[in-house]
Every structure is written in structure tokens, then in C-alpha cells.
Amino acid sequence: MALSSVALAVSAIAVMSAPAAYAETARAFDIAPQPAASAVQDFARQSGLQILASGDDLEGLRTNAVKGTFTPHAALKNLISGTGLTIKSNDGRVVVLTRAQAQDAASQADTAQAVAPAEEPQEVVVVGMRRSMRDAIAQKRSHSGVAEYVSAKEIGVLPDVTIAETLARLPGVTATRDRGNDSQAAIRGIGPRMVLGTINGREVATSEPDRNVRWEIYPSEVVSGAAVYKSSEARLLSGGISGTVDLQTIRPLQYSGPEFVARAGLVHYDGGSEFPDYDRTGWRASGSWVKKVNDQLAFVIGLTGQNQKNGYESFRGWGYNDDKIRSGDSTGPIVAGGPDVPTPWGAGAQAKFLDADRLGASVGLQYRPNERFELTYDLLYSKYKIDEKQNQAWYGGNNWGNWDGANVGAHTEPVIIGGDLVGATTAWSEITAVVSRYQEDKSLLVTGLNGKWMLDNWTVSADLSYSTAERENIWRSVQMNYYPESMTWRLGEDPHISVSQQPDTATFAPEAGEASPGRVKDELTSGQLDLRRDFSGDFWTSLQFGARYADRTKSEAIGYGTNPAPLAGVTVDGSTLKAYEFKNFDIPAMLDGNFDSLLRTVYGANAVTVNPGSLPFNAEVSEKVWEGYVQGNFDTTFINARAVGNVGVRVVDVESLSTGDSTVSQWVEVTPGNWVEQSVVTRVSAGVSYTKVLPSASVSLEVMPGTYLKLGAARVISRPPLNELRVNRSLSSGAPYTGSSGNPYLKPFEADQIDVSYEYYFGAEALFAVAGYYKKVGNYVGYSQRSETINGNNYVLTSPVNSSSSGGISGLEFTFQTPFSALTDVAFLDNFGVYANLALVNSDIKERVPNGNPMPMVGIADQTGIFDLWYSANGFEARLGAKYNSEYTALMGWDSSALVRVRPSTTLDFSASYAVTPAVSVRFQAGNLLDTPSEVYTDYKRHRTGDVEYYGRRFLVDLTVRF
């Protein structure tokens, strides 16, 4: 009887089958007792072997449960023990199952001879980057929902420096850039506010004011894999409308790579080449030790370190005086009797001399004394310090703006675009030279303990976790003014400024400096209990249910700035400072000086003594979350197609409480004729509670061998950013009367979503997929302005509010990846391949600003795409990758109300590695080869300059040793 394939191994989606050595590698198995026909398919997916058997031989048989870590062949023997099936394999890659018959020895020998080939074929072993792609595509294939995966079963095989860069190459995933690094993730055009980040399935604390996870703090060496879940399941934590990003750390008992891996190298940025006395070369180093004490106990210890030196220059507009957008403004004419013309408040140039150090440690322990119990402990610790000198130049603070016509007639040779003043010549415009220093010290600790018990058909898992993140930061500045006779300036897409007197020839009059400290602390404790009952029926395979409790408190110290006054009679001669020119902007020379020396000279020895670590917290949001779920998993046949999926519901109950200071500034006459601005602080608190029911269902239909149709539907939520739940309110002391506040009564974002994915696996590492989705989003949180009379004054207050209407987000995602050997017989192309994806997004959801012409919702990029060309053979691997994103809305800095539009960008990266020996390899990377800047504009008007930053190119070379 001819043999028919009932399952293809999920790791054998390449032209090559899994190598023979692969069959001897221990893996974790979790297969329920069930009919043999479905059991061998589950086994094929989990083992990486190709299984061949006839339907007649499998008919009517039931297999045993297999739970634990075994070699694939040992696991298969346990699976079919007592069933009457026997194993016949020709090369350790393809396994043939037949039902045992009463045969004589001769006929058995004849059968074995017919099955076995005359010669053992040559094995093809796939390692490194290419193996990572194979494993990732295998995980995607076996998952019943819509998801993307990153796999790194061997330490150090990922081509990226941080996991943020790897995530940003997945379909539909984009990353914001900070200090030249990919940082926070957006999924399917929805910004970081609605992305849930987890580590080993656990929600984690963050050092950001909101909930966002900065993925660049996780070095790729400590990550064994990552999953981006785009469709939802009841078993997943609530919180990710756009998706959930889950990083997995190394499980030492399941690890099969080298015991020791050490890596060290240099990182050089070519940005800031004109900055005086600045070394732009840093370093990276890491070491990992995975020790299997015995078959029951193993541990992993990892250490990472990095010093990043990246000098980059930027130019930023300060926004416009425009009462049509901000009702608190008062637009005036620039010529007497003329129409009102919005004018810029000014602009600034900045040079940042980044010097950042990151140290990290990871620990993992896995103990499995028998097949019925497993204990896992893991810990991640990261310490990140920034010491960044900054040179700034602020332009036009005294007469570029024209509030209420106060500077009418001051702008000669005006340039008007779209009704706005974007350029002019002004007399005696103020230039403030700023020598400043930004320091940041933050830490992150993530730890968890998990116990799992397997009792017959029951699996019980208990999990405890704790994470804490802290950040202390302070920005201090020395500020000095001079006034050139004339200044000609132009903003827009090509900003430039010229002055009649260069700053290094001027004498500066110091003004009040600034010290702006901040502090954030986030603590999150959670416990979770999960149970699963396996079934042996023809439809339901298991029932999962569980509960989780989480207690989180995020505290901030805000509004503690000071403004030291300069010493009497002090001046600063520009010639005593170092002058230098920017490479990317046509502006007056920048000035550099010794910050500590200038600080003492201008303000005195102890002028700025603020210690951010000693600041009392004055804004706190606490959150208690109860969650429970039940999910049924099934495996059946639907119209001759195997159908694997789940249906379930998750219930989420949330209580949040915000406590903070409400601040009103007012002028007080402390002595006759001596008026000072003082703040009146009132302690207030408020909160909200709600319960949400979140049903979900998904199914994967194998409509043809290697072809899957996946469907999903769910209701999902994302809790509001924690900083937007603050009760704090701050009001100005004079006109224009403005204020800002959080909103402790915010409801969560909600969405009903549908996902469809067509996936065709047509060869080794070969996939073509098209995914579509629609999300109907309600309770969207945006910033709105309202009027309120306070102390007899009409204030314009800005605060976040929930939208009363819903909107839609829809999109398509295309993925194509393959080695060229699957497309052509041309031998030269055998070791080349391509990875490409394109994401198209459309949404009718708008932010609430600017008035009359609101921006699209944060994160929506109509088009994003990746195109990677790779080569892998004989120990040499190379990748040339291009990444594109169209324009999108983003948050600027830590102010959630500061929305900007990010211009389209294309970046190009290259990486190559060579295995000198099986134990030694070298790697070279070049990032941002096109020196693509980050460019934003404000108020949804392209000519209103926001911020333009040039980070330069990054070059890395390192050495990896494995033994």
C-alpha cells in the first residue's frame, strides 16, 4: 500500500529535511492522548521530523500522552508504545510508521531492505541566521492564530544588536527611534499605547511614565525567542489591542547549543564627527554559561555590557502662535492693519554628546526531577546610565513670535506659506547659547518562579512574578544671551539661519539657568494559576482555565524644576568657548564649553544641588487587576480539512486609584513691592473601576498540505497609559491662562476584531502569506481642550478624554520569504534568499488635535515594508536589508499631548558574519547606511518644523567564541 504523508514536520518546511543529528537533540514534548492520526501530526510539529504513515495503519488506534523532554525518537517510541505501530526510518530525518504484522523473519528483512536506501545521503545542517528563520517560520505554521515569531535557539545567532531591531523587521511591526536606536514597538499601525509587552508571558514594570516597554534595553544575547500575537486567545493576558509582544529567555534543560558563548567588539558612530573633543567609539560585550548539571537540573547565567557613544545634531521648531488651533493663543498681524498671521515662537539647534552605559545580568534555573514536576526560575536585571553633554542654541525667543500683535512690524522680508510665517529678517533677535548636561540612571528587575505539575490528564501551573523599574533624571543648563543686529531665518523643510555676528565673537549676558529633575518608580507583583485537562475525544483536545491577580503602582516626581540666577556682573566671552559648525544644518556656529566650570562661574559653586533621587513622589497611580479565563482547544476535521483552534472567554476586573498634587501658580506680594510667583498645592485623589468580558475564538484550517487558512475573532482591551490616569493638574499664573491635567476616570480602549490569514508553505524556509484584519475601536483616548473658570479667570485646560464614538482600523499584510533554490535550479543562487513584507493600513480614527484638522491616530502608517536579501553558505552569512515606513503620528517625548507627524523614511542596513572555525566567528554590521534622519512636523502642516535629527551611521565589529 502506498504511504501517504499525514503530517509535515513544522521545522522541515525547507527543501532539506531535519538533519539526522536533529533527531538526537532533546526537545520538550506536550502531546495529549488522542487518536493516532492526529497524534502523529502533533508529534511531527513538535519534533521536527517528517512522518509517513498510511491512513489504514493508523485507523482505530489511540496513542499515549507524551510530556517532558526527550529525543524525538525516544518520544515517538513512548507515543506509540502498545499501539501495534512500529518505527522504520531510512536516515533519521524521515520516519515511517507501519502497523506490526505476523511476518516471518525473511519477509521482515525484505521489507526493511525495501525501505532502507543503499547509501546514506549527505546531511545538510542549517545553522545560524538561517536556522533562526526556519524555526520561526515553523512556529508560525503550527500556531492556530495569527502571529509572528523570532527564534534564537543558539545564543548569539540573531544578526541584531538588540531585540528591538529584530522586532521591527517583522510584518506589520514598526519601531520608534530614540538616540539612534529602535526603541518602542507599534503593531499594525497602532502605537505603543496599545501594545502589551511581556517577558516569559509576564507583564513587566517599565521606567517610562506610561506602560510602554523600551525593547532596546534587552540585548539579543539573552533572548531565545519572541512572539508577536496579532490575534487574541483567552489564555493570553489582556492589554494588547494591536498585539502582544512576548520575549522568551533561555530554558537551560531544553538548550542544545554550546555551553559557553562569549562575544566582544567595538561600535562606532560616524554622527557628530564635527563635535569637539568627542570620541564616537564604544564597545559591546556579553558572556553566557549554560550548564546541565544532570538530566534533571540546569542553569544559565548571562552577563552583558555596552558603552554607546553617538553624537547627533538636531533642529527643532517651537510651535506656532495660532489661536485657530490653540484657543489660548492670540494671533496678531505682522504688519499694521494686515490680516492675522500665525508666527513661530522660535527654534533651537542642539548637539548631543551621548555617553551611555548598559550593564545586564540574566539567570535561569530549570529543575525537572521527574516527568510529573518542573520548576523554573528566571531573572533579568538591567542598569542603564546616560551622561550626555548638550550644546544648544535658541533663536528668536524675543521677537519671532507675535502674540496679540506685540511684535507687529518686526518681520521684514516675510516668507508666507499656507498663511503662516515661515521666514523673515528680524533685528536684535535673541540668541541663547546653552551648555547643558542630561543625566539619567535607570534600572529594571524582572523575576519569576513557575511550578508545573503533570498528573495523568491534568497539568497545573502556578506562577509568581515581580518586576520593578526606576528612573532618575536631571537636565541642567547654563544659559547665555546675545543679540545680533540682524537675523535672517527660514523654517519649513530646509531650515536655515544666518546672523550678522557669529556667536564666538560675542559677549554673552548670562540669564537664569535651569535644573529640571524627574523620578519614576514602577512596581508590579502578580500571581497566576493555570489548569489544563487533556481529553482523548475526536473534537476537544483540552480545556484550559485559570486566574491571575496583579498589583501595580507607578509613582512620579514631577514639577520640581529650579532656576538659579546668575551672579551679579558676570559675562562670558564667546571666544573662550569652542566654536564648531553643524554638518547637516546651515546655522550659526555652535559653542561648546566645560559644563561644570561654566556652572560655577555663572551661578556659583552650589547653585544647582538638586538630587533627583531625593524628590518626593507627587503623582501616583495604583492598579489592581483580577483576570479569569476558560478556553477549550479542539482538533477535528472540517470539510476534509484538519481544523485546529480554540474558543474561550476572559473576564477582567480593574480598580485604579490616582493620587497627586493639583497646582495653581499665583503671584504673591511677600513684602511691599516684592511680588513672587508661588504655587498652591492641594492633594487630591480619584479613581475608576470596571469589568470587561472578552470572548475569543480562532481556527487554523489545513485546506491542502502546506496551505493554511486561519480565522480569528475577539474582543480586546488596552488599559489607558498610566501617566494619562494621573489626577494632577497644573495651572498658569497669568495670561494666557492655560492648564493641563490627567484624567483618572479614563476607560480602557476597546476593540472588536476579526483576523484572516492565508499561509502557503512551499519549501525550505519558504512562505507566502496574506493576512487581513479589521478592528472596531471604541473609547479611544485623545487629548482635548475645554474652558473652565478658575478664580475668575477663563482657563483653557488640556486633558485626555475617551471618545464617545468608535472608529475602524483595517489592513493587509503580505509576507514572502524563500531561498532562491525553491524558485530556480540555477546553482549559483542556491545559497541566496529573500525575506520581504509589506503592511497596508487604513483608519478613520482621528486624534483631537489640531482643532479643525485633526491628525490620524497615533501609530497609523499607511505603508511599511521590509526587503532583505540574504546569503548563507560555508560558514558565511550576509544580509542587506531595506526598511520603509510612510508618514505617521507619534508622541513627542514624555508629553502624551505633544503629537507630531513623522515624515516617511527609508533605512538600509548590512550585516555579515563568518565562522572561522566551529568555535570562533566574526561579525560586521553597518546600520543606517543612508544616514536617514528622523523628521517630524507639527500641527499637521508640513511647513511647521517640528524636529529633525541626524544620528549618523553605526558600524560594529565583534568576535564570538563558543565552546
Q: PLM features: what roles do these ranges have?
A:
Residues 40-42, 46-47, 99-156, 192:
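Short, acidic, small-residue-rich periplasmic hinge/interaction motif at the N-terminus
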Residues 95-98, 139, 164-203, 230:
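Extracytoplasmic beta-strand/coil segments of soluble accessory domains associated
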Residues 202-230, 280:
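Short acidic/polar hinge/loop motifs at secondary-structure boundaries
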Residues 236, 252-258, 293-296, 372, ...:
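Short loop/turn motifs that connect adjacent beta-strands in outer-membrane beta-barrel proteins
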Residues 435-444, 613, 617-623, 688, ...:
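Outer-membrane beta-barrel signature, preferentially recognizing the C-terminal barrel domain
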Residues 772-777, 781-788, 793-888:
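Gram-negative outer-membrane beta-barrel transporters
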Residues 884-891, 913-963:
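C-terminal beta-signal and adjacent terminal beta-strands/loops
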